[in-house]
């Protein structure tokens, strides 16, 4: 029997604010444990929360970027549960009046994992609908040692935005693409750095399976706190197969909360799945209703940048790039800006794009440390090729040196003496030498075997250590053979 997976994601995004959601404590990753805390984020009696305006604006901005409906009013609620890293024994969140409802994320071809990528030219693009976007506070972080445990409350109270998708996702690969596309939008809007290693983007997955074609959905399980996009894909692959195996043997799926054990490569039960009523939500009496219309929405609208899909379209139209080139360059706003700066003074814009995509990204493993190379270097390199002073193979080698040594193409050419030989006089002599040294190739060429010309070209290229202009050599050989034939 064939089965179908039904998947929905809850993505928690740490907002890019200077201070916490309800107090003035600094948000600082890696600070000394419990050094960024106060009575408010420690939940001490009598300490009253005060909402962070910037966090509210960033949440509204996200909703606008996703095409959500912005609520005229939003409120904060207490989500009650006990956990050691929750100092108040409740979390301030939003229940029935979130700041944003609806919206969608479009899956673009290059967002899929490399071993499952779609055709960049494909016209059909699936959209994953958004249920809601709401604001809540983060909890502290537990640390477990050999004989005891500790809690760092520096993270408690950090602004978190939760983005809940509809259960529109049908495979681990679509989940991967959704997270990649969503992260791209958030980075473009400068809402969050989305650094998963620092816990700035975490994901909970709801997944169930059902016989293909059946309308009724199966019993869902939730996999908590997945901290990488690849982990989401791996966890879903395993859990889908586990549920299919359970159903195939005639057993039933238990609704439960799971965690992903990366070392064992399997999901592990944590507890039975909670329902909304288990949390006893009620409005937070210490916080007023948030009125979004007017100033807050106006400020959020000002911050909306050119979004990824818009940038891809513009790169295609302005620079005559194809879908693949524009998608790669637009995958990161920093890379796209870098390309545009490089292309501004290049005679061949497409060549600059190809150098960045095919050569630069292959050797620059860390974009943030690689980008300080002046963008003008790629314009200069492209122009040297256009002017016939370098051929493509030399240019590709120069990119490696540029990244490693932070030197300009002109400086590298001068230091290594690798400029292209374009002198007709010099190359004419070498072509005559090639003809004299390779009588069989000459005979083959004159008898109609045109490919024999490559042997003569190879002779000249070897003599010049690859520095001869291949097109000039080709033309001179044809001309000389014709004149001496």
Curated annotation (Swiss-Prot):
Keywords: ATP-binding, Ligase, Nucleotide-binding, Protein biosynthesis. SUPFAM superfamilies: GatB/YqeY motif, Glutamine synthetase/guanido kinase. Its EC number is 6.3.5.-. One of its GO terms (molecular function) is asparaginyl-tRNA synthase (glutamine-hydrolyzing) activity. Allows the formation of correctly charged Asn-tRNA(Asn) or Gln-tRNA(Gln) through the transamidation of misacylated Asp-tRNA(Asn) or Glu-tRNA(Gln) in organisms which lack either or both of asparaginyl-tRNA or glutaminyl-tRNA synthetases. The reaction takes place in the presence of glutamine and ATP through an activated phospho-Asp-tRNA(Asn) or phospho-Glu-tRNA(Gln). Heterotrimer of A, B and C subunits. HAMAP family: GatB (MF_00121). This is Aspartyl/glutamyl-tRNA(Asn/Gln) amidotransferase subunit B. It comes from Methylacidiphilum infernorum (isolate V4) (Methylokorus infernorum (strain V4)).
């Amino acid at each position: 029997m064939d089965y179908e997976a039904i998947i929905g994601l809850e993505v928690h995004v740490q907002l890019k604010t200077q201070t916490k959601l309800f107090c003035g404590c600094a948000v600082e990753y890696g600070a000394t444990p419990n050094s960024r805390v106060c009575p408010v984020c420690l939940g001490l009696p009598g300490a009253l929360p005060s909402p962070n305006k910037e966090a509210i604006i960033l949440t509204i901005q996200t909703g606008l970027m996703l095409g959500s409906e912005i609520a005229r009013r939003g409120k904060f609620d207490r989500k009650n549960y006990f956990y050691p890293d929750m100092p108040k024994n409740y979390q301030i969140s939003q229940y029935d009046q979130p700041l944003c409802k609806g919206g969608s994320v479009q899956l673009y071809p290059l967002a899929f994992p490399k071993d499952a990528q779609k055709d960049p030219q494909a016209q059909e693009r699936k959209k994953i609908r958004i249920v809601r976007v709401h604001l809540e506070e983060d909890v502290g972080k537990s640390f477990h040692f050999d004989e005891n445990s500790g809690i760092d409350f520096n993270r408690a109270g950090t602004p978190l935005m939760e983005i809940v998708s509809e259960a529109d996702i049908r495979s681990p690969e679509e989940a991967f693409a959704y997270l990649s596309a969503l992260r791209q939008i958030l980075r473009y809007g400068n809402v969050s750095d989305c650094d998963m290693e620092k816990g700035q983007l975490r994901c909970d997955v709801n997944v169930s399976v059902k016989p293909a074609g059946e309308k009724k959905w199966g019993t869902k399980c939730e996999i908590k706190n997945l901290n990488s996009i690849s982990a989401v894909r791996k966890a879903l692959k395993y859990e889908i197969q586990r549920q299919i195996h359970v159903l195939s043997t005639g057993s039933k799926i238990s609704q439960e909360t799971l965690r992903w054990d990366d070392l064992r490569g399997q999901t592990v039960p944590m507890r039975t799945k909670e329902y909304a009523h288990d949390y006893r939500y009620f409005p937070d009496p210490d916080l007023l209703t948030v009125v979004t219309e007017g100033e807050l929405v106006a400020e959020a609208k000002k911050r909306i940048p050119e979004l990824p899909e818009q940038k891809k379209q513009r790169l295609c139209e302005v620079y005559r790039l194809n879908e693949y080139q524009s998608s790669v360059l637009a995958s990161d706003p920093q890379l796209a800006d870098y390309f545009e700066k490089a292309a501004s003074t290049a005679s061949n814009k497409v060549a600059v794009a190809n150098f960045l995509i095919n050569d630069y990204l292959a050797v620059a493993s860390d974009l943030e440390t690689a980008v300080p190379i002046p963008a003008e270097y790629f314009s200069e390199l492209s122009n040297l090729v256009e002017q016939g002073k370098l051929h493509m193979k030399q240019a590709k080698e120069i990119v490696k040196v540029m990244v490693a040594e932070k030197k300009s193409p002109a400086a590298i050419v001068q230091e290594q003496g690798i400029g292209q030989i374009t002198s007709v006089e010099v190359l004419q002599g070498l072509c005559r030498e090639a003809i004299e040294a390779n009588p069989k190739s000459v005979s083959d060429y004159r008898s109609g075997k045109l490919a024999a010309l490559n042997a003569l070209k190879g002779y000249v290229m070897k003599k010049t250590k690859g520095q001869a202009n291949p097109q000039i050599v080709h033309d001179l050989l044809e001309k000389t053979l014709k004149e001496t034939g």
